[in-house]
């Protein structure tokens, strides 16, 4: 019996947009035979009172530890943008992976990124700036290209890039991920999981 490829969807979400996208990514990845999919979030760094006051959404996904990243064949990271970069919470989490870097524990593992922005600014920059950290770990970065047909739809406001799935939350966070954005997220999960299964052989 062949060993299943282990896929981790690892995200940070304050208001729930990236959480919703993460579920869609995991749904797509779960379609692939031979893939075992896990969804986890990085720890919140804001004090609970401030998180609640800011309108943060309580989430049920278990919290990941940096050390466990080595247990997966592919990791799909989800983060909202913060001035064209990953969120501080994701940055803090990845800054704790020095031991994994020193041992080469993530070398050759697949990595892909999806994101959320308020008005669309910084979508691609957030993904590509996150790639920098993953490249230092020797991870194999997987963009999604234009295979998802929704990327060609210009009839409505939507996220989605050849670098990875994205959603536009609106300046006040009131816009939820659209069906088109979720479809692109599912494609990203399915695509990365399919590659991981092939490489797992």
Swiss-Prot record:
Molecular function as annotated in GO: flavin adenine dinucleotide binding; FMN binding; NAD binding; NADH:ubiquinone reductase (non-electrogenic) activity; NADP binding; NADPH dehydrogenase (quinone) activity
Residues the entry annotates as binding NAD(+): 15
Keywords carried by this UniProt record: Flavoprotein, FMN, NAD, NADP, Nucleotide-binding, Oxidoreductase
SUPFAM superfamilies found in the cross-reference section: Flavoproteins (SSF52218)
The record's free-text note on cofactor binding: Binds 1 FMN per monomer.
EC assignment: 1.6.5.2
A cellular-component GO term for this protein: membrane
Reactions catalysed, as given in the entry: a quinone + NADH + H(+) = a quinol + NAD(+); a quinone + NADPH + H(+) = a quinol + NADP(+)
Annotated positions binding substrate: 101
Binding site for FMN: 13-18, 81-83, 116-121, 136
Cofactor(s) the protein needs: FMN
Keyword Nucleotide-binding carried by entry: yes
Domain Flavodoxin-like: 7-192
Pfam families assigned: FMN_red
HAMAP family: NQOR
Family per similarity comment: Belongs to the WrbA family.
Protein name as annotated: NAD(P)H dehydrogenase (quinone)
Organism, scientific name: Shigella sonnei (strain Ss046)
